[in-house]
A protein has these predicted regions:
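N-terminal, intrinsically disordered, polar/charged segments of Gram-positive cell-envelope systems
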Residues: 37-71, 76
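Netrin-like (NTR/C345C) domain of secreted extracellular proteins
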Residues: 2-53, 93, 128-208
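Mid-length scaffold segments of soluble, non-membrane domains
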Residues: 98-133, 140-148
Length: 208
């Protein structure tokens, strides 16, 4: 499985020279395929020290919305180990991807067998200029840094799921195994998001 870090590091294959005439021919062929290869590869740019913004108007979440979000996804309590921020320019579209590795301490709802999970969140803007210094993210991501603890609601990336990035079908699993939905805090046995409070037992036992 190719991950985004391999996309950053991917280099074209060397070509073998077969004599003077063959070498010239190989150089021409090699140049053609290198161009094709570079055109096909994603122009992944790792963004250091991004300035986070929320550019999409998020509807105000109600208590039932929060409960449905948690009940219908995998919910874990864990600690952020690593964060990366990627920008991909493709034609008139720009993708902003946040990837996080979270060490799972407790599975509150659903199944997550691995000790760590790789989460991805993506924002795509087409024909809408975003200032170079800005990096759009979903709510709850901006203050995630290594060491941040929280309750994460995620959904597993389905096998074969792809994003169309610049006309290229790109496997979502190149960036993560789970899609970010929301991050909450844990306070006195309850899940808290803004001013909404849900007893953790209400999420654990819903539908049972």
């Amino acid at each position: 499985m190719m991950r985004w870090k391999e996309l950053l590091e991917k280099k074209p294959h060397a070509w073998v020279k077969w004599g003077v005439i063959a070498a010239c021919l190989c150089i021409v062929i090699a140049g053609f395929f290198v161009i094709r290869q570079r055109a096909a590869a994603l122009p992944v740019e790792q963004v250091e020290n991004p300035v986070f913004v929320s550019r999409e108007e998020e509807p105000e979440m109600q208590r039932d919305d929060l409960k449905n979000m948690l009940v219908n996804n995998i919910v874990v309590w864990g600690t952020v180990q690593d964060c990366s921020y990627l920008r991909i320019r493709a034609g008139d579209s720009v993708w902003y991807l946040t990837t996080m590795r979270v060490a799972v301490d407790t599975v509150i709802r659903g199944e997550a067998d691995a000790p760590t999970i790789d989460i991805v969140s993506g924002e795509c803007y087409t024909g809408e200029p975003v200032p170079e210094e800005e990096f759009p993210v979903r709510p709850g991501i901006a203050d995630c840094i290594p060491g941040t603890e929280g309750i994460f609601a995620v959904s597993p990336v389905q096998a074969g799921a792809v994003w169309d990035i610049g006309g290229r079908s790109t496997a979502v699993r190149e960036f993560g195994d789970y899609i970010y939905r929301i991050r909450c805090s844990l306070q006195e046995g309850s899940i808290v998001y803004d001013d909404l409070v849900l007893p953790i037992s209400e999420v654990e036992t819903a539908g049972s």
